[in-house]
Amino acid sequence: MFAFYFLTACTTLKGVFGVSPSYNGLGLTPQMGWDSWNTFACDVSEQLLLDTADRISDLGLKDMGYKYVILDDCWSSGRDSDGFLVADKHKFPNGMGHVADHLHNNSFLFGMYSSAGEYTCAGYPGSLGREEEDAQFFANNRVDYLKYDNCYNKGQFGTPDVSYHRYKAMSDALNKTGRPIFYSLCNWGQDLTFYWGSGIANSWRMSGDITAEFTRPDSRCPCDGDEYDCKYAGFHCSIMNILNKAAPMGQNAGVGGWNDLDNLEVGVGNLTDDEEKAHFSMWAMVKSPLIIGADVNHLKASSYSIYSQASVIAINQDPKGIPATRVWRYYVSDTDEYGQGEIQMWSGPLDNGDQVVALLNGGSVARPMNTTLEEIFFDSNLGSKELTSTWDIYDLWANRVDNSTASAILEQNKAATGILYNATEQSYKDGLSKNDTRLFGQKIGSLSPNAILNTTVPAHGIAFYRLRPSA
């Protein structure tokens, strides 16, 4: 087996392409919420959104931070005589303002969708050339979030400058309305979005669309490996495919602007529990948005307990906002049914001096894996405090809600008080500063200088740790 290293490139580019603060004051941590597309596609309605929001609230997920309810494509019936977008009255009989008001009255934020093209991806009216009237439509309907796609763009791509100005037109139009609207680019990473996205948007997709597969290759997602500048992003991209493309991009994201690895597939399709845990952990660690793609009215207990794992969410919502770095990657011989097999180690700094560490097993069998302080603190000099200190190891999945408790919550449609973390009452930032034990996992040991962190990681699974300085 052999390894790939990206530390030199990442360290060099950090000084050249730094990340600006939020251009509009939003997105200080990655957004969390729910989006209709992964499960429902065009089968959307007012009732679906309101029922979903009620369920998210009842299950305690809203108070964990999942506050954006995002209506994706297929909501429009065209334009009126003045050129303004019109909602489909059969799907949304009371109009979008009614949906927004219901969500706002229940402490949610409302997201909608359009495309920087003549049409949306499903063939509905797009916003290319109509940015100002469409931005005003969204503002008039009290929208808080816009997902802005890339279909039917009339060939206006091919260089970063061309794509930048096409997406900047909507950014300027949204700002002109005077309403704070989170701007989420969905241009699939085309034309190196991660270099220019932070100046005009709060997040940007960096790859083709995700599918509920961990490693399965698909000809519709033609680029693999670390092809971060894929000329045809495609769709049906596996979790590992997207993660590997994201590996070198962390230096271009941070507070106010995030690499978006696409919606979460936890609870969608037939991923194993270990695959869902690895998926959620890595999206959290690289500071991708945490957007639920599942039908929350039919969640299985194990998926619910993943979405509600506060110690993992706290990694994502860490106020320092630095995505983790892939320190090493090895291909392995025990490939899965698709011929895929690799192992990786990721590490990243956290706001309170802690460090997050992941050992990721993309192979087909459980295996012993290990790492050292020298690898974990790869940027530190020999003799530094990080390398000469002892660190307590906290397992971020050890205190996961068990399936019996999760099933009871789902059946009763009510999260029992005190079981889940409530970020409405106490933000993740405040909870971390106060050392709230629910956000740190369970201590399982310590790692001293020159020692080795050893563990066994399941196939398509992860070992996920927070390291804290010993008292």
UniProtKB/Swiss-Prot annotation:
Documented EC number(s): 3.2.1.22
Chief location bin: secreted
GO CC term, one of those recorded: extracellular region
Disulfide bonds: 42-74, 121-151, 221-237, 223-230
Gene Ontology process terms (BP): melibiose catabolic process
List of catalytic residues: 149 (nucleophile), 209 (proton donor)
Name of a matching Pfam family: Melibiase_C
UniProt-annotated binding residues for substrate: 72-73, 147, 205, 251
Glycosylated residues in this chain: 105, 175, 270, 370, 403, 422, 435, 454
Family from the record: Belongs to the glycosyl hydrolase 27 family.
Name assigned to this protein: Alpha-galactosidase 5
The organism of origin for this protein: Saccharomyces cerevisiae (Baker's yeast)
